[in-house]
């Protein structure tokens, strides 16, 4: 039974609408099933600070509110009839899901509003997490699990003729994210709510997400993912919460001396709220998503009535498309503008909302100097960077603060999480484009840049001008810009001149010359000068000099993040070291106090407690408590049972039951049958060259090649049966990644139909991999591959999820792999490959032609070129592994270098898997060692070290 507060849902932002202390509303009686007997719902105004009840949903008791299966069934039946989203004739699964979700939402709203009211009353400091992605997954099972109502909802649905698991399967994954960035954000929200921290998330409400992935004979195909087609029962549109967002226009200085941004294109950002419940707590926080439209007065009614319908709707179409797609293609100028509009919409609407809340809570007298004491803004990567100039703009232009005041407030409020060391992912925007789209923000960025220049000059002085110039070139926010005139004179070198008296006689080659000219410290006669000029003229005729290209002026968003915030954190120890020593080394030398590490984590609720109930029950049984779900350090207690035969038997049984489920899932999704007795070897993540799915599939090809050269008896003696599972999306415009996906499916099509190989080796590509697929695959995994080129993966989170579920990792010393290996034990992690500090030297050796490829690597490439996997020769794909340098050449990601150690490490995997006692022991120790990688630990660190917020527990 679950404890809920007794607070009635109501409007959350506009409190002025509550004028009457009592309202009486006639509603259907849900407890009577679908009978339409009327009765009165009593709602007392929250402004009286009196408790309220929803009598038809819950029963009030002294210790809290309890929901049982009967009242839940009545609630579901009520929504099936009175919250119509489907035809009334039948109560089929889609309708059952929608009604069940709305029933759960009723329960969430009770706590949601109570949380909001309590935050308003206490006016404590609150954290705001801004992210372009939130990869939530399905909400139903997670919500009822956090409410501790899983059993009650299962029983209620059984009464109504349905199974909870089947009903939950009808929920589409929310298409609000793509990869680790969005999944981390969602894990953080779960931990924030569970740990009772006052916080909100802010994002965009994408209509079509990134894309829905289909796998055809031609490889990956992208189609729109209309996850909102049947509506979203979890969201509540806040029609009274909208903010204007402006693009283009111009900046003028008014008679009052203030800057005014006028003209241009105006849209409205409208709030959609999604409740995020904590586990075993009443705290329910908000994820506020922005959708975009134009104000109704901007609709061109005249053009519409004149028959120019497209023109009349143009403004609305331009506004709506901002929230159509996550990461729209940006090869075109239009695509770049759309992406920048997305980022600015997120920043502007969110900050306006945060400021409105701060002003409302402050009352009549707003003390802006207290803003950083009430607000912490965390930028999840560089996408929300425009928070910095936008906050300054609002404070100066709209609130009347000085530059000094606005800059001080902004720096104390904003913090930045870096998620990548890849140069292409450290965002840069065209200065020309930004100046056109956001003219006021460019002015502010220029002021920040000039302020930074002055600070650098002040810090390092002018004794070493070469060093100073390099610092400025590397650290400035504005790239490829001239140095401001205020300090340009520091770098002006005096010209060397010599005075020659034309009447003075000079002896040159034994001759006396009276007229001479000075040329580069050598005296040249007039005749020699004429001769040189003739030669220069001839050279000019022979050559058509090509002027050096002028590099484009850019705005470095990552540099702006570092300069404009008070904290910069990496997401794993090795990543944070690279950030300090390489990516932002100049900034680290200037402001070492800004830089921190916050190793990522994942929520143990979704990623083991709910997705792997069989293993969770075993853990609880052997530890003797379920407290590990909130305190994962207790997982370490499993270490003392790692060799216990009874535990090992139960552990293997749980793993096999999960594999049976996955085998059924793969058959349904791909058509391929796999054996649950095989090892499930899984690599699921975004398709990218640095993540090296190519290394994995080349290793599989080598394995297959060996098998084909052996007899059946030799094959079975050397290899353990494996099901190699891939999943992940390649960005639509990332050609090489799409080639890798195509190659994987081609290899699978050949191997999976080879009767000689049978169940000894299968290769499966799971189309449209998402959170729901992960919740099935991860509990069933035996081996998981995290094999990025060392030094290129910031952290990763899937490695943590796999380890938490007793999966053994094979990987490089990269990202969080380093810390996972430390915690689970070196002997329980399969390590291979070059280390991060070796990478630069290895690339240099390759460029110099010193790399000698392993014979086995060359054999694999030749095997592929023979057409074993179809008529495609894969020239472009294999070509990237050949040559010594050049775009798309030279094996930049060191697949060839690491290939020998990789396949040798895979042989060790086979050897370990043969002894199931050893393998199960390793599996148990991986779960035991995963305790550090809970997002609860990460959030505690953010709250203490960056946000300075405290948990707020309901009285």
From Swiss-Prot:
GO biological processes: glycogen catabolic process
UniProt EC number: 2.4.1.1
Enzyme class label: transferase
Entry GO CC: amyloplast; chloroplast
Keyword Transit peptide in annotation: yes
Chain residue ranges for the region called Disordered: 522-550
Transit peptide: 1-43
Needed cofactors: pyridoxal 5'-phosphate
Family to which this protein belongs: Belongs to the glycogen phosphorylase family.
Name recorded for this polypeptide: Alpha-1,4 glucan phosphorylase L isozyme, chloroplastic/amyloplastic
